[in-house]
């Protein structure tokens, strides 16, 4: 067989095999809302997400509420979040975090500056910080960009706490 007939299929095979291991680049985060109209649109998008999450968790122990500063708060009781003495995320909390990740995909201006988890005694300890870190890891594994997440923190209450904001604020 002449070389000219082998070349096109060989070239296609090389190109396809080279592309097989490539991953698509992560799209950049949208710019922060800077005008009052953009901030209003971001706040309205967060309100829509609060209603959507509220409908998902209606009649469950999960509390979804709007705070006075316009942020959304989500609280999940500790007993549904972590086993005593463990930092692994339980399935109920994983389901909440999955919905939060979906909500963050739908509201690209939203951020989660607070991810707080309690210790078994509702005190601040390394276990509480480890739990908050596991929550952060879970959200990252669901495609939430690290830049949209605040540092993990211990919670001073008996519930897991998440706070979502509409416009980027300085993360702690």
Identify the role of each PLM range.
Residues 15-18:
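C-terminal motif of bacterial Sec signal peptides marking the signal peptidase cleavage site
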Residues 52-61, 83-115:
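Periplasmic peptidoglycan-binding/anchoring modules of Gram-negative envelope and division proteins
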Residues 38-47, 57, 67-98:
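Short, solvent-exposed beta-strand/turn patches at coil↔beta or beta↔helix junctions
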Residues 20-23:
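Bacterial signal peptide processing site
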């Amino acid at each position: 067989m002449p070389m000219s007939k082998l070349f096109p299929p060989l070239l296609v095979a090389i190109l396809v095999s080279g592309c097989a291991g490539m991953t698509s680049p992560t799209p950049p985060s949208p710019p922060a809302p800077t005008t009052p109209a953009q901030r209003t649109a971001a706040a309205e998008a967060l309100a829509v997400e609060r209603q959507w999450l509220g409908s998902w968790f209606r009649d469950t122990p999960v509390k979804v509420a709007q705070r006075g500063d316009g942020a959304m708060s989500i609280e999940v009781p500790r007993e549904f979040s972590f086993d005593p003495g463990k930092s692994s995320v339980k399935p109920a909390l994983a389901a909440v975090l999955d919905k939060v990740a979906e909500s963050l995909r739908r509201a690209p201006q939203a951020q989660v500056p607070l991810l707080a988890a309690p210790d078994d005694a509702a005190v601040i300890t390394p276990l509480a910080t480890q739990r908050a870190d596991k929550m952060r890891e879970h959200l990252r594994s669901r495609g939430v960009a690290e830049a949209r997440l605040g540092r993990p923190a211990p919670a001073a209450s008996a519930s897991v706490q998440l706070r979502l904001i509409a416009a980027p604020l300085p993360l702690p």
